[in-house]
Amino acid sequence: MLTITSYFGFLLAALTITSALFIGLNKIRLI
């Protein structure tokens, strides 16, 4: 159970970081 929770937590963190970087790059391009 703990392993699954940790896996989903890591996946969510990776997705959040990727989205943040993608949005950041788009803002830089707009500027």
Curated annotation (Swiss-Prot):
InterPro entries: Cyt_b6/f_cplx_su6. The chain crosses the membrane at residues 4-24. GO terms for biological process: photosynthesis. Disulfide bonds: none annotated. The keyword Transport applies. GO terms for molecular function: electron transporter, transferring electrons within cytochrome b6/f complex of photosystem II activity. It is found in: Plastid, Chloroplast thylakoid membrane. SUPFAM superfamilies: PetL subunit of the cytochrome b6f complex. GO terms for cellular component: chloroplast thylakoid membrane; cytochrome b6f complex. The keyword Transmembrane applies. It is a single-pass membrane protein. Keywords: Chloroplast, Electron transport, Membrane, Photosynthesis, Plastid, Thylakoid, Transmembrane, Transmembrane helix, Transport. Belongs to the PetL family. The 4 large subunits of the cytochrome b6-f complex are cytochrome b6, subunit IV (17 kDa polypeptide, PetD), cytochrome f and the Rieske protein, while the 4 small subunits are PetG, PetL, PetM and PetN. The complex functions as a dimer. Component of the cytochrome b6-f complex, which mediates electron transfer between photosystem II (PSII) and photosystem I (PSI), cyclic electron flow around PSI, and state transitions. PetL is important for photoautotrophic growth as well as for electron transfer efficiency and stability of the cytochrome b6-f complex. HAMAP family: Cytb6_f_PetL (MF_00433). This is Cytochrome b6-f complex subunit 6. It comes from Coffea arabica (Arabian coffee). The gene is petL.
